[in-house]
């Protein structure tokens, strides 16, 4: 654990921002980045980190004392970080969170998960939302999903996009040998798990080669730029076999260190983000931040993001055949690679500081700070 504060010095208006989990986890990274952005906009913030649930339990007395002195206690929560099941995660948090805590809830349950999983996770998230004084989600889409579970008000603070286009333009995109050839590939960024879009990308490439013929020069490899989610190692073998049966290739790079992430995103031939059940996406934000315009499946969340940041996505409406529609979008990118880059006038706001101000306004209202 790091960042333990002297709670005797906690003034009203101070924020204890808590992250739980491995530093490379997307929700944990988001929490750390949000805490830093809150500081940059002038908030008094102390970041408390715990790499597992046991360490988090050790923070509980600190959180209780801080709340007693008027400080805000805010956590980023996805159920998988707090227990082996959603029910266990909710049991823990409902039991130990101090009165007046607030949460940003991630990975809101949705029906496409399947009846049993949706019911279990939905009940857990409903309990969490009812147990705290303020709930934040990352999109209007997520707020609607939460409203289907529980009658609790939730504020929307979008995932920020850091505009790194200028720095990216100056940098030479050098990637490790294990990522060589990205410029020839269709590339998905982030964790590998079912429904992320890898299978659809292979179907789309198959359709494109069917239309264009075997020697067309269209991409023949799909690269998953990121690690495999826990429990889904079998998916890699399944996708590899599927690709080979189609005359294509599939590879997984594994975890991408921060020092290579931007270079890898810049090097990618065709950015692809066809999440089946996406409700908030750090991988979409990553593509956008370096100036890439990803091909994305149209849906309530991606359409919301396209309205929030016009010009940042190439939305694909299936119109009967998702693979055929995606093949058309990939064909456009092959014929005109400039389509995979953002136009010079595209605005990427809200950024990290904008979103930090939104969150602080929520905390100010919840805690009635003057």
Which residue stretches match the model-derived regions?
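Membrane-proximal helix-turn-helix segments that form the acceptor-binding/catalytic region
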Residues: 92-96, 117-134
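Conserved donor-binding/catalytic core segment of Leloir-type glycosyltransferases
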Residues: 175-196, 202-205, 222-223
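A conserved mid-protein helix/loop that constitutes part of the nucleotide-sugar donor-binding site
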Residues: 29-33, 193-210, 285
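A charged, aromatic-enriched C-terminal amphipathic alpha-helix characteristic of glycosyltransferases
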Residues: 321-325, 334-370
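Acidic donor-binding loop of glycosyltransferase active sites
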Residues: 263-279
């Amino acid at each position: 654990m790091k960042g333990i504060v002297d709670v005797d010095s906690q003034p009203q208006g101070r924020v204890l921002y808590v992250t739980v989990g491995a530093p490379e986890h997307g929700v944990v990274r988001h929490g750390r980045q949000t805490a830093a952005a809150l500081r940059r906009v002038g908030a008094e913030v102390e970041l408390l980190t715990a790499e597992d649930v046991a360490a988090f339990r050790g923070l509980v007395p600190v959180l209780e004392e801080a709340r007693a002195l008027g400080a805000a206690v805010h956590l980023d929560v996805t159920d998988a970080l707090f227990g082996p099941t959603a029910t266990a995660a909710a049991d823990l948090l409902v039991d130990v969170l101090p009165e007046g805590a607030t949460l940003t809830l991630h990975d809101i349950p949705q029906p496409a998960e399947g009846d049993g999983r949706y019911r279990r996770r939905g009940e857990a998230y409903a309990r969490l939302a009812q147990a705290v004084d303020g709930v934040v989600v990352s999109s209007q889409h997520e707020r609607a999903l939460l409203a289907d579970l529980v009658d609790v008000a939730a504020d929307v603070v979008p995932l920020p996009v850091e505009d790194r286009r200028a720095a990216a333009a100056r940098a030479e995109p050098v990637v490790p040998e294990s990522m060589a050839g990205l410029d020839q590939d269709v590339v998905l960024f982030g964790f590998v798990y079912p429904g992320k879009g890898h299978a659809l990308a292979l179907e789309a490439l198959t359709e494109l080669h069917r239309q264009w013929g075997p020697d067309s020069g269209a991409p023949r490899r799909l690269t998953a730029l990121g690690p495999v989610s826990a429990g889904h190692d079998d998916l890699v073998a399944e996708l590899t076999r599927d690709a080979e049966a189609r005359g294509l290739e599939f590879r997984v790079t594994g975890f991408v260190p921060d020092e290579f992430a931007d270079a890898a995103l810049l090097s990618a031939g065709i950015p692809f983000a066809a999440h089946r059940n996406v409700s908030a996406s750090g991988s979409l934000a990553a593509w956008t931040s370096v100036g890439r315009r990803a091909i994305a499946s149209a849906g309530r969340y991606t359409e919301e993001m396209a309205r929030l940041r016009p010009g940042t996505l190439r939305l694909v409406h299936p119109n009967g055949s998702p693979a055929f529609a995606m093949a058309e979008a990939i064909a456009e990118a092959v014929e005109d690679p400039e389509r995979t880059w953002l136009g010079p006038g595209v605005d990427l706001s809200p950024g990290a500081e904008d979103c930090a101000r939104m969150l602080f306004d929520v905390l100010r209202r919840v805690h009635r700070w003057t």
